[in-house]
From Swiss-Prot:
GO terms for molecular function: urocanate hydratase activity. It is an enzyme of class 4 (lyase). Pathway: Amino-acid degradation; L-histidine degradation into L-glutamate; N-formimidoyl-L-glutamate from L-histidine: step 2/3. This is Urocanate hydratase. One of its GO terms (biological process) is L-histidine catabolic process to glutamate and formamide. The gene is hutU. Its cofactor is NAD(+). It holds the Pfam family Urocanase. It is found in: Cytoplasm. It comes from Bradyrhizobium sp. (strain ORS 278). Its EC number is 4.2.1.49. GO terms for cellular component: cytoplasm. The active site is at 410. It catalyses: 4-imidazolone-5-propanoate = trans-urocanate + H2O.
Length: 556
């Protein structure tokens, strides 16, 4: 019996102001857990898979039911402990402590290999939590849209005089994260050709408005890119195919995209990447019966994929790894120069991290989109001079379809996050919003992750692999009063390659919530400034000084 499969269930988060838990502080994680498994949100909800290969919300359906039951009975001074998607304990703590503590996929470093994880996973002892899947704060593809948009805009600024009109981006992968790419590209003014091997993913992105259209062939897709470039219009096109075949074919034809990247689930060579020449049915069958053969075939295919990206890079085309660890997989298979093109964080995003700026997000527990529109207006009111952010919010309202509970992603940093959180809390208190707001972020943030092939690649002081920082981030968020805190391993780039922490906090309109919000939403981004200042980045040191951070090691 497969305890992870239930084709009969359809999970959706409750809407409205009536709650089934004892307070909003426990109703919030309950709704966000359920929201992660909404069919409009999750990639494979019947298997508890939210996104990112096999990133799950709960270990199995029995664990899901027990988590739900535990949250519904949890008292205001109790904390639920969740070990890799299974509820293992309820303890007496205090009202300002987190209501839920989550640890996912963590393995002692010597044993932190994909093989060992897969063995534990098969035994039912662990699950893969990705980043926001197992920490219950995934909001659909919107969760990464702005970060991807900001990256594309920065590429345009650096390489194309700030104008991406008439340019097109080649990429692959339209899953939960990669599915944000087409919309981010067109928002930035560029066209996109996105290769995807699974028809259901193309269909979902078309249905949710993240993708404009599908091409029937590579020739048609290229014709659409040429037409868009000629007319300087922005269009996103999905192409059913395998990137390991399409990318090299484009090199062979001499096709020159303007930007090249990739968001296939290469971090998981068994469950996330279709080997070259294989059918989906063959892949599905052999993942269970011959996982090592699948892994070998997938990683061999990645070599050709990455070599094509290297070829584009050699042509002078801006080419970037978007954090799926595909370069490492290719290098493991003997492609020595796989890292010759950069990752997106050191190339384009790190200056934001130095100022504690990252993917701040919130969701309306009421389920009413008007609550999000009202908070959008509040953000504009509080940050009147940030025209770039205003433009983003306007585009987001116009072009992003909500998946599950209405939510918003908005990159802001130290000094602004706590102000927004307090303002949202006041709106709840005054009855301007129909229910409380949950505020969280991706684990991809300035101070919450150690990932040498992504967020902490090429750190100035060589501290790429130091993972004390996400541990300290999680501990500080617990001490500060976050509503739930998570500590994960392997998100984004796969098992063995990252450690990262998440936090979520509820704005329920109370004075107690205001005190917690002020602490958490200051301290959380401040750890990012601290981490980058400690590594010697002048922007971070300046930000720390400007905000009065007390960093003893940098005292002059």
């Amino acid at each position: 019996m497969n305890r992870r499969l239930d084709n009969q269930r359809v999970i959706r988060a409750p809407h409205g102001s009536d709650i089934s838990a004892k307070s909003w502080l426990t109703e919030a994680p309950l709704r966000m857990l359920m929201n992660n498994l909404d069919p409009d949100v999750a990639e494979k909800p019947s298997e508890l898979i939210v996104y990112g290969g096999i990133g799950r919300a709960a270990r199995d359906w029995d664990s899901f039911d027990r988590i739900v039951a535990s949250l519904r009975k949890l008292e205001a001074d109790q904390t639920l402990v969740v070990q890799s998607g299974k509820p293992v304990g309820i303890f007496r703590t205090h009202p300002d402590a987190p209501r839920v503590l989550i640890a996912n996929s963590n393995i002692v470093p010597h044993w932190a290999t994909l093989d060992h994880f897969n063995a534990l996973d098969k035994m039912g002892l662990m699950m893969y939590g990705q980043m926001t899947a197992g920490s219950w704060i995934y909001i659909g593809s919107q969760g990464i849209v702005q970060g991807t948009y900001e990256t594309f805009v920065e590429v345009g600024r650096r390489h194309y005089n700030g104008d991406l009109s008439g340019k097109w981006i080649l990429t692959a992968g339209l899953g939960g994260m990669g599915g944000a790419q087409p919309l981010a590209a067109t928002m930035a003014g560029a066209s996109m050709l996105a290769v995807e091997c699974q028809p259901s993913r193309i269909e979902m992105r078309l249905r949710t408005g993240y993708l404009d259209r599908q091409a029937a062939s590579l020739d048609e897709a290229l014709a659409l890119m040429e037409e868009a470039a000629r007319t300087k219009t922005a269009v996103s096109v999905g192409l059913l195919g395998n990137a390991a075949e399409i990318f090299p074919e484009l090199v062979r034809r001499g096709v020159r995209p303007d930007i090249v990247t990739d968001q296939t689930s290469a971090h998981d060579p068994i469950n996330g990447y279709l080997p070259k020449g294989w059918t989906l049915a063959e892949w599905e069958a052999k993942r269970a019966s011959e996982p090592k053969a699948v892994e070998q075939a997938s990683k061999t295919s990645m070599v050709g994929h990455v070599q094509a990206m290297l070829d584009f890079h050699a042509m002078g085309i801006p080419t970037l790894d978007y954090g799926n660890n595909i370069r490492q997989m290719a290098k493991d298979m003997g492609l020595a120069n796989a890292f010759d093109f950069p990752g997106f964080v050191p190339a384009y995003i790190r200056p934001l991290f130095c100022r504690g700026i990252g993917p701040f997000r919130w969701a309306a527990l009421s389920g009413d989109p008007e609550d999000i529109y009202k908070t959008d207006a509040k953000v504009k009111e509080l940050l009147p001079d940030n025209k770039h952010l205003h433009n983003w919010l306007d585009m987001a309202r116009q072009r992003i379809k909500f998946q599950g509970l209405p939510a918003r992603i908005c990159w802001v940093g130290l000094g602004d996050r706590h102000r927004l959180g307090l303002a949202f809390n006041e709106m709840v208190a005054r009855g301007e919003l129909k229910a409380p707001i949950v505020i969280g972020r991706d684990h991809l943030d300035s101070g919450s992750v150690a990932s040498p092939n992504r967020e902490t690649e090429a750190m100035k002081d060589g501290s790429d692999a130091v993972s004390d920082w996400p541990l300290l981030n999680a501990l500080l968020n617990c001490a500060s009063g976050a509503t739930w805190v998570s500590l994960h391993h392997g998100g984004g780039v796969g098992i063995g390659y990252s450690q990262h922490a998440g936090m979520v906090i509820v704005a329920d309109g109370t004075d107690d919530a205001a005190r917690r919000l002020e602490r958490v939403l200051w301290n959380d981004p401040a750890t990012g400034v601290m981490r980058h200042a400690d590594a010697g980045y002048d922007d971070a040191i300046g930000c720390a000084e400007a905000n009065g951070l007390d960093l003893p090691s940098l005292a002059r």
